[in-house]
Amino acid sequence: YIDETYLKNVLDAPLIEAAKHNIAVAAIILVEPAAKCIDPDLGILLQHPNYLRGVYTMPNMTNLESVNCYAAAFDFLAKRYCTTNNRYGRIAHWIMHNEVDGSVDWTNMGIKPVTVFADTYIKSMRICYNIVRQYDEHAEVFASLTHSWTQIANVGWWLYTSKEIIDLLNV
């Protein structure tokens, strides 16, 4: 199912080179909407059911099959890139999605109250954390937010402020 040539050339090679030079690598985890996914069935499974538009979708956390698929992807990546021998290189930092306060474009799951959005985001982060830490106790998982702490940066693209999401992450 996985294109080994792609992995070796596009992911492994630069990660191995970074590991040789003791460079810590951060990976941004993004989920393409089904229409852009090379495997439409997989895309439908991972795309949030309320996705409306945007570059990326929030992963689907609404059913067990989708959650298990999402978790399996992390398990595959963590087994490969969180080992002590660095055979394929290493991902030290896992950045969950992109500028999530700009959710309309970067992690679209439709228009939701900030509490519902943050709950889904936290679930996505926890899946990553719980899986990668099984393979690398030093791996770190980060949130991704804009610099727009208390005001919505771009009305129409942003639904929440960074502070609203951070406050809910800290509950």
Residue ranges and their predicted role:
Residues 1-82, 86, 92-95, 101-113, ...:
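N-terminal substrate-binding region of glycoside hydrolase catalytic domains
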